[in-house]
Amino acid sequence: MSRASRKYLLSLLVFGSNGIIASQISLPSWQIVLLRTLLGGTLLALIVLGARKRPAFLDHPHDAAYLASSGAALGVGWIFLFEAYKLIGVGIASLAYYCGPVIVMALSPVLFHERHTPAKLLGFAAVICGAFLVVAQGKGVALSPWGLVCGGLSAVMYAVMVICSKRASNAVAGIEASAIQLVASFAAVAVFALVAHGSELAVPLSANWPAILCLGLVNTGLGCYLYFSAMGQLPVQRVSVWGYLEPLSAVILSALILGEALTPANVAGTALILGGAIFCEVAGKRRGAEKTSRRLAGSRSASNLAA
């Protein structure tokens, strides 16, 4: 396994523990996200400044704007996600959040002119059924309706984040891109905090500061650094498929460490979500290989005729 692959896997495991660490912080969701983005954004900004190179975003303002929009959506999505963590549990909230890629795939024909194949539609159906199983099983244990809404809105914000990121070119990438996103995330959350909780910004000294620092510096700052620095060195197929290990690790870790119940419906829903997503990726790769083979075959035929 290459170094980039190890870094990417480590970042996914780190992200998968976000909910567990957040559950140890007795602060409002918006305050947790505010501290997280402040600490993580500051760390990455210092790394970029320490490189002593001219930042690429100065020469590519449009890309910077897309990344900033992506970061703002990320911050708002985290507010909803952390609220869902507290109301419906880490496992279900994480899986609801990762319905966001399904929204992106559903909109891809309109936004990115990507054609839906029968295999992709089958994968979509599996993911949607999995999400239904995960959420529907909670009716018997009185899951918070607002918690489910927060989980759904976090998925929508995830989709907005991805769409804005894809609109940006690779001119601004890696740690610089993640720094822009985290700083923009902090700005968006700070505006929300000032408007909605202007007089409540002070964090009590009795807060769990070790958990706050871990979530901000390690899970957000270092996690994003590992994630983005590895992503540029890995095939897109591997990045896409392995990315779904994050919600899986969140579910498993929440069951092992927090003792959250992992019911048969949870297991079946998890399998459908992950299996459907992976099936979509594999089917897309196979279709691309078939197109390449046909193109090469056509080129050989043309060459033979010319000869």
Task: Identify the residue ranges that each predicted region occupies.
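Specific alpha-helical transmembrane segments that line the substrate/conduction pathway
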Residues: Q31-L34, L38-T42, F82-H113, S154, ...
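Hydrophobic transmembrane alpha-helices of multi-pass small-molecule transport proteins
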Residues: L44, V48, A68, L107, ...
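C-terminal-most transmembrane helix of multi-pass membrane proteins
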Residues: T37, V48, A136-Q137, N208, ...
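Helix-helix packing/entry segments at the starts of transmembrane helices
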Residues: S5, A93-C99, S165-F186, T220-L256
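Loop-to-transmembrane-helix transition segments
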Residues: R3-S11, P55-L81, P145-S154, A202-L222, ...
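Transmembrane alpha-helices of multi-pass small-molecule transport proteins
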Residues: L27-V76, I103-V104, V156-C164, A179-H197, ...
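Glycine-/small-residue-enriched transmembrane alpha-helix faces in small-molecule transporters
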Residues: M1-L34, L38-T42, A72, V76, ...
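Hydrophobic/aromatic residues within transmembrane alpha-helices
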Residues: I25, I32, A84, A96, ...
